[in-house]
Amino acid sequence: MLGLNFKGSWRQYQKQVLDRFQDYQADGHVHLVAAPGSGKTTIGIELIARFGNPALILVPTVTIREQWVDRIQTAFLEDGQRLSDLVSQNLKEMKALTIVTYQAFHSAMNQLQSQEDGEAEDFMGFDLLASLRAQKVATLCLDECHHLRNEWWKSLEAFRKQYGPLKLISLTATPPYDSEPELWERYIRMCGEIDQEITVPELVKEDTLCPHQDFAYICSPTSEEAERLRQFEDSKWQYVNQLLTDTDFQKLITNSKVLRGNITSDVLLEDPKYLSAILIYLHSQKLEIPRNLQELLGTKEVPQLNYAWLETLLQGLLYQTPDWYDDVNDFSKKLEADLKARGLVEKRQVSLVKSKVNDQILNQSLGKLSGIADIFLIEYDSLGQELRQLVLADYIRKDFASYLGDSQASISQLGVLPYFETLRRSAQEHGISVSLAVLSGSVVILPASVKEELVALLPQIHLTFSAVGRLNQADYVQVGFPSTAKGIVAAVTELFQRGRIQVLVGTKSLLGEGWDAPCVNSLILGSFIGSFMLSNQMRGRAIRVWQGHPDKTSNIWHLVALEPIRILPLSGEKEEQDLNTNQDLQTLSRRMEHFLGLAYDYDTIETGLDRLAFPKPPFKKSQIRAYNERIKALSKDRASLREKWQSSLIVADKLEIVNEVAASKNKIPFLVLVDALKWVRFSLILFALDVLYILFRLRLYKVWWLTLACLLFLSFTVLRYVFFKSPYVRLRLLGESIRKAMLDSGHLSDEHSRVQVDEEKERYALFTYLKGGSMRDKELFAQTIGEFFAPVDNQRYLLKAEKAPAGQSAYFAVPTLFEKRKEDAQKFLDYLTPNIGQYRLVYTRNEAGRKILLESRIKSLSNKNDRILTKKKVKSALK
């Protein structure tokens, strides 16, 4: 026994995990998925105690390592027990519980020197396996193990292989559900199947997390940035239109080996989009397309030239297929230089549709400074002295320190110190008395009024206080401390908890992981770099309950910069393109795909940007202003936020998270209906024969049975027609066929799962999802349905209709799970045939198949803006 006894009381969801410990550990693995704030570390320590063996605990960072140590001391050790007797943070001095980072473990496994957060250790000549065996370590606990560098992961796999049997505990807030199958299998081989998942809605229901809401505040670029964006678009448009009429460019294309017949069909069809781009260009310039290439294209309709197709043409000309062109005058070198000079080429990639220049302007837009100031004023107006706001940034920007306090100094970068100065100016301008502070690993700035309290909290550390920039030393001071000092973060956090600091600005690296301040009731994510794991952890800082404050609610603010730019169409285009989807917006969209929260317009809990009622492109300034005004009003109504969570959580005693996939009604295969119509026609013929028979014989009593049979048959077929006419029914049958195919192929783990379809009339959409089964099952099913309905791109296998009804696609894609072998693809089709009718399997990697692929891609160009909408949603597990 390890002598660990939990001193608190377990919450219901924690108790459920521990009550099922015997079941979970039967295979030697306990794998728990738990949202930030769920007490995952505490459960992990209890599981280690129940195994009762010396344990090695691996964690991502030094901060989280110290959090584990602190939790053991405060929650599990009795008076008289010494932490140092039980716990070590050094692999060379192991104890019953040894807690180290993955980086230190990797260095020890490979006998390297380790340098991490100021801690240095030389593992040259150190035998890790022998040391662990000497300590009789029999339990391994992995905290967030899938977010590792590849070399660390390899060290972990090598250790498992060499060390022998171990009891394994895996804890994570963010399992890689959406990863490639190979990565998922690698993860499961290491950690075992997931035993239980604790979600954010469950934690809100249990009062472990507070009611909260996400807000996406749309920031407008500065006038200078907006002008740069406009100039870039105008310059691009002028250059592109000049290029299209350039005789040298036209000569280079029209004299290509492709048009002279010197490139074989096999080569042309290896990647058909470059051939398509040439033909589309010829069509746009009203030039003749060779008959053999038109036949190879497989379609009479050629789409309009747009930026996307011109980008493909230039990419092929310069980088992908330059051998197709005889460039005797080196025109392509001049073309490449011109494109680079205009920011339209980077790292051998032509970018006309998406621009890295524009992305960078918007991502780092100084308009976000105004956004942060606006949000601060909104929240202060709502909460006053109760405001506890955390602002997180990617960088400190130490070089700006000398400008702090100078209200006339221009701010040219985003970061901790620019955010602090922006908030200081805003508070000063509006006459607001608020305590601001900066907390990072190397820069700490505090209100002068808290100096004595900080000294009292850190009596063992020699602190110095000095002026910074032009800030009045009576208002703010910079804190100096030895680089080896411990406890600075904890002390400043305590001042924040007490309300002596109301707005804390810091770096995501310091405050994003492991740091805990339950008082935070407003979070501004001014960070634009980082994975979902990090943004999830940052968000987790704001949604914890605050003891003694049962009415706490929290607002999480995301910043996104948008500038409605009129994209000038290319010559000959019929409609204007919308290219407003920038990297900043895509980052926000990816974040929201993973965060379960309240929908603005419905009493539902789901993921996705749509739940925030975010405007749809093309964006207009009036639309953006109206949206920002709406979320300002929503953010102030915290009482309604709590009520809405309560009404949304009355789903059932037991919650289930499902992955919904939206399907357009006109894309659901309709061939079952054709089959029904065939029977309707047949029954009508029989009925007509019956009538003719009656007319000729005029002996009705002798043919009553035929009349009755015809009427019954007609009724049956009409009902069948009406039944299958429903897209709701057709989608459910299609989903069930796909579920059976996945089950038969071993891709689903639970044979008792079932397919359900919901119709959301307000959104004019049908959503299908898998009910029951593991979260991985749900994720895979949603992915497979989404791939089936996705526009044709470059899939390995397609399904092609023998004859498709008007308005229905003649092509569907075989999903990734079934495309590796022909047998798998055929099995997929066999399961679908009863519900979609006569489709045949097309292999797209030979000449005949590539022609069909090209044809299907050309025909699906009208659907180029189709997006497969997926989201997670809370449902009743009993429904």
Where do the language-model regions lie?
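Conserved RecA-like P-loop NTPase helicase motor core
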Residues: 106, 409, 425-431, 438-607
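Post-DEXD/H (motif II) to motif III coupling segment of the RecA-like Helicase ATP-binding lobe
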Residues: 149-209
